[in-house]
């Protein structure tokens, strides 16, 4: 049979028939058995219980009540603003919109049940003990995946997927928000455009294709990026980067105490921070590793060979020892340390937007190379950031020093000081501010 109640503060039992309630208040409840179907337009009360083989539908759920779905039953909440949809024992539950939730409940999925949220703006989806849960479009809230649970988010625009304790999570496309993996959890992001995957505490995280965003690996976590085409993988104390493929546009940042295992370099940049071993005698560029190496904050590389197409960045606090430059580029920032260098072609570029002092310690052997001190940001009118370079000992011949000058103003210029030099011929090329501003220079200038 069919029964309908407009407003109810009591109990409705449905067995094999169809029952509906317009508004359910107070301690009221709807109980559905024996293949029955129950419908509630607005639930402001206790619960709707959907038993084996039955169907329950709630249009709007406003309170801390519960839709309980079990034993192969099917339940739907069109809009859930408060309360809980609880699915267990093989049941199937769907929330069309989880919106402005008060934080108490959301959707709970376990014991081989299946839960789906089509649009998630707030609240929680909690899955564990063999449950499987999906969010089609997440713009807020949290999907929590625990012991033996499986969670999936098709598109993550904001919010969080939190995986731990043996749970497994997947985000198909992440544009923002976060996936947090710990305590033996396993998480995968198919395409990472933005946001963060954080892996720690024995968790395992994989990004199939990274175009932007960040993967942060620490504290016994293991992280892999199958194609790092953009964005940054950060590996810090206790974390391990495993089998990552670094391509052009991507960056791997390795901090002290972090580990990298079996990385493949196909381009991009790797920055090492406060690491003094493990990066000696690398070949960058043609015939070697196609990657730009950046050295900062107490990190050191020794015996590096930089061929055509290779590049090394010596940033503040970084050290390069006994480097051989054969057609590639070394870029040095103020505060970087270079000692013992051989240049056969190639370029050394000094970069500091505020000017600064640079030193090349030991012997610089430079043949047919370029040392560029110019401020690349200045094309006219503005005053360059003038720099000074001190070389302990200069050897070789045919190298060109390119300097910023101001011959008309005679106010300042780049300066090169050579303490000792072997016999050889080198050249000075100037980028003069007066010339850039079309000011005629006449007479003697020093």
Q: What are the roles of these predicted feature ranges?
A:
Residues 271, 279-281, 388-389:
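Intrinsic low-complexity/IDR segments
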Residues 1-7:
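Low-complexity/repetitive intrinsically disordered segments
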Residues 293, 304, 312-313, 321-445:
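Extracellular beta-strand/loop-rich repeat segments of large surface/secreted proteins
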Residues 7-9, 15-16, 23, 34, ...:
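Acidic, glycine-rich low-complexity segments
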Residues 5, 12-14, 21-24, 30-32, ...:
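Fold-core signature of tandem repeat domains
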Residues 62, 204, 259-262, 274, ...:
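N-linked glycosylation sites
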Residues 131, 185, 203, 221, ...:
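Short, well-ordered turn and helix-capping elements at secondary-structure junctions
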Residues 36, 73, 91, 113, ...:
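Extracellular parallel beta-helix/beta-solenoid repeat domains
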């Amino acid at each position: 049979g069919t029964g309908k109640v407009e407003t109810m503060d009591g109990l409705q039992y449905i067995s094999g028939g169809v029952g509906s309630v317009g508004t359910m208040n107070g301690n009221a409840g709807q109980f559905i058995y024996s293949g029955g179907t129950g419908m509630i337009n607005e639930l402001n009360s206790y619960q709707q219980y959907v038993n084996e083989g039955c169907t329950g539908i709630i249009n709007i759920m406003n309170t801390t009540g519960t839709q309980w779905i079990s034993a192969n039953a099917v339940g739907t909440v069109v809009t859930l603003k408060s309360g809980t949809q609880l699915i267990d024992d093989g049941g199937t539950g769907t929330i069309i919109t989880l919106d402005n939730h008060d934080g108490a409940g959301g959707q709970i999925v376990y014991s081989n049940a299946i839960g789906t949220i089509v649009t998630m703006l707030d609240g929680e989806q909690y899955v564990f003990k063999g449950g499987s849960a999906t969010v089609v479009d997440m713009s807020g809230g949290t999907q929590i995946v625990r012991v033996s649970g499986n969670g999936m988010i098709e598109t993550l625009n904001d919010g969080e997927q939190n995986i731990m304790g043996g749970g497994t999570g997947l985000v198909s496309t992440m544009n923002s928000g976060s996936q947090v993996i710990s305590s033996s959890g396993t998480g995968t992001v198919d395409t990472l455009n933005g946001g963060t995957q954080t892996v720690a505490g024995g968790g395992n995280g994989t990004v199939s294709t990274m175009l932007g965003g960040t993967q942060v690996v620490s504290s016994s976590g293991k992280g892999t990026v199958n194609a790092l085409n953009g964005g940054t993988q950060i590996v810090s104390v206790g974390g391990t980067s495993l089998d990552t493929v670094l391509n052009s546009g991507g960056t791997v940042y390795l901090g002290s105490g972090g580990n990298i295992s079996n990385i493949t370099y196909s381009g991009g940049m790797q920055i090492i921070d406060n690491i003094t071993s493990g990066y000696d005698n690398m070949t960058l560029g043609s015939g070697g590793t196609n990657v730009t190496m950046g050295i900062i904050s107490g990190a050191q590389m020794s015996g590096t060979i930089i061929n055509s197409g290779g590049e090394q960045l010596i940033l503040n606090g970084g050290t390069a020892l006994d480097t051989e430059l054969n057609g590639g580029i070394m870029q040095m920032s103020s505060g970087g340390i270079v000692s013992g260098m051989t240049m056969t072609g190639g370029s050394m570029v000094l970069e500091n937007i505020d000017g600064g002092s640079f030193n090349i310690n030991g012997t610089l052997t430079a043949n047919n190379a370029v040392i560029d001190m110019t401020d690349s940001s200045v094309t006219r009118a503005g005053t360059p950031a003038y720099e000074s370079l001190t070389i302990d000992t200069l050897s070789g011949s045919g190298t060109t020093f390119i300097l910023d000058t101001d011959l008309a103003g005679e106010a300042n210029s780049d300066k090169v000081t050579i303490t000792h030099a072997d016999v050889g011929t080198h050249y000075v090329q100037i980028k003069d501010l007066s010339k850039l501003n079309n000011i005629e220079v006449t007479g003697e200038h020093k």
